[in-house]
Amino acid sequence: LGSHTTAIGYGALNTQNFTTATDTYNTAVGSLAGASVTTGILNTLIGGLAGDALTDADHNVAIGYQSLTTDTLGSRAIAIGREALGTQNFATATNGYNVAVGMQAGKAVTTGVQNTFVGALAGDALTDADFNVAIGMQALTADTLGSRSIAIGHGALETQNFTTATDSYNVAMGFKAGNAVTTGVENTLIGGLAGDALTDADYNVAIGSEALSSDTLGSRSTAIGRAALNSQNFTTATNTHNTAVGFNAGSNVTT
């Protein structure tokens, strides 16, 4: 008794079954696209195996081969790109609100919610992590359990990786900003290569191209301006409390 359904391709929507009159507005295009949907509505699934495990899930968009291919009961997801959100799987009805656009973007997400990934391999290792934004190729690409990170730019926070659930509150915006950060938290790094050598360092602010670009383990530094504190480098964990504001400000400071 389902109405307003479009199914194109081998096995597309072949298990959909409404026993009462229902306007489904489901669209499935591709071999086995939406093949397991039973009573879900308002889904748009385009591509081979797109959303093929979804059952009673609603308001999903999956475009691309094996996009959103594992999930059964997750709703309100947008997966555009080959294998985008390919392993997301909610075993209970959940509004995930995950958005992944790009080849394998958010590919490893299982039960994380409210993440936004735009770019090839963006956030592709995250599993049960929430409230992240990764925009740019390989942005936030290594992390598994870090939450509340913002990485915008090619390779931003590329090596950040928390293996236990952690709210990182890291913000990195710019080409390879915070590129080497592993387990540092609460860093704000804005500008091309800003803080790009920092690893397990915390509470830093680097704003400007190449600001704080050499330091690995210094914490609590503020560098604002192009190349500010760009020679500072502490190889052991150190609270520096250095502040440099201006073009090349403190550029000769090392330790």
Locations of the language-model features?
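Glycine- and small/polar-enriched repetitive beta-structure motifs of secreted/surface proteins
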Residues: 1-255
